[in-house]
Regions:
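N-terminal, charge-rich interaction modules
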Residues: 1-18
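Feature captures the catalytic cores and cofactor-binding loops of soluble hydro-lyases/lyases
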Residues: 22-23, 27, 31-46, 51-115
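Short, low-complexity, charge-dense intrinsically disordered segments
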Residues: 118-124
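A contiguous, well-structured "functional interface" segment within a domain
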Residues: 1, 60, 120
Length: 124
């Protein structure tokens, strides 16, 4: 599914990265914990979150995520948007909450991120 299709499905506003809306999204991951994003986000994944700080953009960049959707009408500050633009990470915002975003995307064919780990990997 292309990011432009996701924008329509989620009634989302593009905050930056209009030129990147033709990116192909293979899966999505919804979370508000950066530590879980670091464990589970794989390349070509769309991150859905209500966190708006600059750390989300840095995490998305490190994990090779293809974009970030902020839910609940939230928007990051100018520094996060500027960092995202320099990193070629599209940012979108929607008034829908996380649960509804995930449901809409799933119904429209986008699959959840399938990376898993067991407790032995996490705990050492």
């Amino acid at each position: 599914m292309k990011l432009s299709e996701i924008q329509k499905v989620l009634d989302a506003e593009v905050l930056c990265g209009n030129n990147l809306l033709q990116r192909e999204i293979r899966s999505c991951f919804a979370c508000d914990l950066i530590s879980e994003m670091l464990l589970y986000v794989t390349p070509d994944t769309l991150v859905i979150t209500s966190l708006t700080n600059i750390h989300i953009v840095h995490t998305a960049r490190v994990m090779d995520a293809v974009g970030v959707v902020f839910v609940g009408g939230k928007k990051p500050d100018a520094a996060a948007i500027m960092t995202s633009e320099m990193s070629d990470i599209p940012l979108l915002t929607t008034n829908h909450l996380i649960f509804e975003c995930c449901g809409r995307l799933f119904v429209n064919g986008l699959k959840p991120n399938k990376k898993t780990t067991d407790s032995a990997d996490v705990c050492g």
